[in-house]
Amino acid sequence: MYSVLVQETPMALLQLLKEHSSLFAFSLLILLLKFIYKDKSRKRRVKLPPSPPKLPVIGNLHQLGNKPHLSLRCLAEKYGPIIYLQLGEIPTVVVSSARLAKEVLKTHDLALSSRPQIFSAKHLFYNCTDVVFSPYGAYWRHIRKICILELLSAKRVQSFSHVREEEVARLVRRVAEFYPGTTNLTKMLGLYANDVLCRVAFGRGFSEGGDYDRHGFQKMLEEYQELLGGFSIGDFFPSMEFIHSLTGMKSRLQETFRRFDELFDQMVTDHLSPKREKEEHKDLVDVLLDIQKKESTEMPLTMDNVKAIILDMFAAGTDTTFITLDWGMTELLMNRKVLERAQAEVRGVVGERRVVLESDLPQLDYMKAVIKEIFRLHPPAPVLVPRESMEDVTIDGYDILAKTRIFVNAWAIGRDPESWEDPEAFEPERFIGSTIDFKGQDFELIPFGAGRRGCPAVTFGTATIELALAQLLHTFDWELPLDTAAKDLDMTEVFGITMHRIANLIVVARPRFP
């Protein structure tokens, strides 16, 4: 669910070069000599995937552009669905078709199940001891098992149904308050996503203020997203990692980590306090602390492990819910017939009841098709979190050497004309009668990844999205402001750890019920 290619790569790189030109010149000279020596000393001939021309030292970094998912699709259209890039010091393979995604995520899943050590992730996620960024091994298998069996099981997801229902009701009240004026729906959806995950993870919301909010939680999240999704030269030139101390990147990471760690320490202290009121339903911190207390295995969880897992759950979950709902409502307002059909279905199932129940959701086939179409065109992470090969493998006749970084362009796969008819059109009808799903078995549609590294929170995320979308469709009639035409909505993407719309969605939401 994260994407960690660079944001505004060329500009960031040029700014760094400008500020530290002498140091970079010396460092790049060393790298150039190193590359020349490496090329001359290579003894074994290998058959690498097709590759565009590269520059000395930086390799193909300059070809990523401001929106790497688009640049990589353009390269795939020219060189094929599997390409080789030299991103600084990092050998990289990018796949952009469902057939080859299956090779990476299923056929060679185990051999390609590790993670590269991302500079920002090491500093934010307790030295990569979370589920997403931890390298493959016994520890990762242990914490993933905890996530699947304890934190995100079907029973656990169901136990949080009251949280989803209460937060959806709060979302509806917030939106209704602005009628007959306009509503910044993007902001409302962001509050909903944050509050659901905060209550599930920590036992309380944040948008209403309180003790935790004095830490500036929302600002911390924004800084975290910027740091994790921004350009980090150490990720492509590991031998030059020392430069982060000079550019200020390392100090920013350390300060953001310190603030999160302080907040998590307070949360854990609150949960362990004997004066804390017993909650009817345990939150995720409760569950992890119980596991930590009971575990007698050779691999007990440390408190830092607990905090890393919680940050993972929260960071991944909020963005997925928010982005999907924001893109979804935007697409529906641009496609009025789809909106009307989805509303008619929901209202036909729910009737005159004001509240959509989770038991209504299995009957909403067309709305589920709408959500699949949102995931196809706007996967939260356009490029899946990179994998790293643990051994040599062969894909499509090409040699993929150990320690190669592997990117899967989920955005390009969702728009591949080899897999989809009229791929740029928003047409949920394509999923009616289709067995294609987004849970990792159909490689044409992989917004949550697949295989061992697939997102374990699919069930939770889907429930959070479906209930909110159904209730919004049921409760309100939706229009754009009089001065805004659907064709003029800004669909510009902001590429980072996830892919947001650059503009807020401003709407008029007319309540159906008094």
UniProtKB/Swiss-Prot annotation:
It is an enzyme of class 1 (oxidoreductase). GO terms for molecular function: heme binding; iron ion binding; monooxygenase activity; oxidoreductase activity, acting on paired donors, with incorporation or reduction of molecular oxygen. The keyword Iron applies. Expressed in fruit kernel, seedlings, leaves and stems. PANTHER family: CYTOCHROME P450 71A9-LIKE ISOFORM X1 (PTHR47955:SF19), CYTOCHROME P450 FAMILY 71 PROTEIN (PTHR47955). Keywords: Glycoprotein, Heme, Iron, Membrane, Metal-binding, Monooxygenase, Oxidoreductase, Transmembrane, Transmembrane helix. It is found in: Membrane. Its main location: membrane. One of its GO terms (cellular component) is membrane. Its cofactor is heme. It is a single-pass membrane protein. It comes from Prunus mume (Japanese apricot). Pfam families: p450. InterPro entries: Cyt_P450 (IPR001128), Cyt_P450_CS (IPR017972), Cyt_P450_E_grp-I (IPR002401), Cyt_P450_sf (IPR036396). Its EC number is 1.14.-.-. SUPFAM superfamilies: Cytochrome P450. Glycans are attached at residues 127, 184. This is Cytochrome P450 71AP13. Heme binds at residue 455. The chain crosses the membrane at residues 20-37. Belongs to the cytochrome P450 family.
